[in-house]
Amino acid sequence: KASVGFKAGVKDYRLTYYTPEYQTKDTDILAAFRVTPQPGVPPEEAGAAVAAESSTGTWTTVWTDGLTSLDRYKGRCYDIEPVPGEESQFIAYVAYPLDLFEEGSVTNLFTSIVGNVFGFKALRALRLEDLRIPPAYSKTFQGPPHGIQVERDKLNKYGRPLLGCTIKPKLGLSAKNYGRAVYECLRGGLDFTKDDENVNSQPFMRWRDRFVFCAEALYKAQAETGEIKGHYLNATAGTCEEMMKRAVFARELGVPIVMHDYLTGGFTANTTLAHYCRDNGLLLHIHRAMHAVIDRQRNHGMHFRVLAKALRMSGGDHIHAGTVVGKLEGERDVTLGFVDLLRDDFIEKDRSRGIFFTQDWVSMPGVLPVASGGIHVWHMPALTEIFGDDSVLQFGGGTLGHPWGNAPGAVANRVALEACVQARNEGRDLAREGNEVIREAAK
């Protein structure tokens, strides 16, 4: 009787995929998963199951396994540690060989690592906490179209955070009135105004009309203030072709920056747009609409720092990153952790800030973090202290809510910002004297 060389049937994952003696390679992509196994499932088996199902494995041995080198291609769970203070939660560290992923494709990276495993029966919950992207892989990405330094040079704005404002009411204005609101804000002293993430091309305001009126507002404000101004024209659309059509039109109008919702639009569309922006000198502002669907649960989904790393590879010059002080959730150290991951070239492993791996970006351009959502002029000292110069501070209601109107609201924000930056440069302690600084400036 002929034998095929292996026994049929269900096989424990940990026999193949749990390898505590494995030494990680410099080219491996490393992942830290927070695993909550079902009762009765040992953590090694749960960790190995994640490694298997997100790389080469399936639930049984198949005869085609003999046609490839599993040792070369399999993901490996190489370490497991309990999560302090949590019952039956573990951090499983998984190493993936570089060759499992297509070069320059965030889409493929995510399809592999988080594509299938999250519905797995052996797990009660699963969260991807962090990824280490090796230089061998990150170098296959173009990254941000321009990055922080080039953006400052284009705008001729140095030594301070940039100021933005989302135009409200977000839906319902006509294009002409929308342009008017943009003009008032920019004239008052803001650097940027922004389309809301859900302003695309609706019946009350078609995209082309909005683009034209916003460009007019921009040029008028530029002429009056002598400063370079921008408005994030949202190019997000139902199809990639339509998105590119909008980006091309923005370029023809000569505006400096366009915008994209990268999670709802998808990484494929985002990377396409980022390449176009680099080739055509457009800055790219990224909004993270839908992120909380993915990242808000503590024990399931994916931490925002992973989405932030993915965006830096896919490409964007600004990305929304929480405020630490406004209306939306975000803890200070953890937020600062992924803010540094966006801006800096080299970030040390630091568990207190939620950073599981040392990340070296090998000179990939940085992304400006955008603080937006429920912040106003009294937050200015805290914001300048927390985010430093390389950031964009966006006040929607905090500008447009000024009782005298948009332009005075914009003036108030700009004055407050300049006062805080000056106070900081003079060595004053913003945490203690912040309110005093703002009061003095308000005179």
Swiss-Prot record:
Instruction: Mark the residues carrying the PTM N6,N6,N6-trimethyllysine.
Output: 7
Give site residues, Transition state stabilizer. 327
One molecular function GO term is: ribulose-bisphosphate carboxylase activity
PTM comment text: The disulfide bond which can form in the large chain dimeric partners within the hexadecamer appears to be associated with oxidative stress and protein turnover.
The free-text cofactor remark is: Binds 1 Mg(2+) ion per subunit.
The family annotation for this protein states:
Belongs to the RuBisCO large chain family. Type I subfamily.
Name of the protein in its database record: Ribulose bisphosphate carboxylase large chain
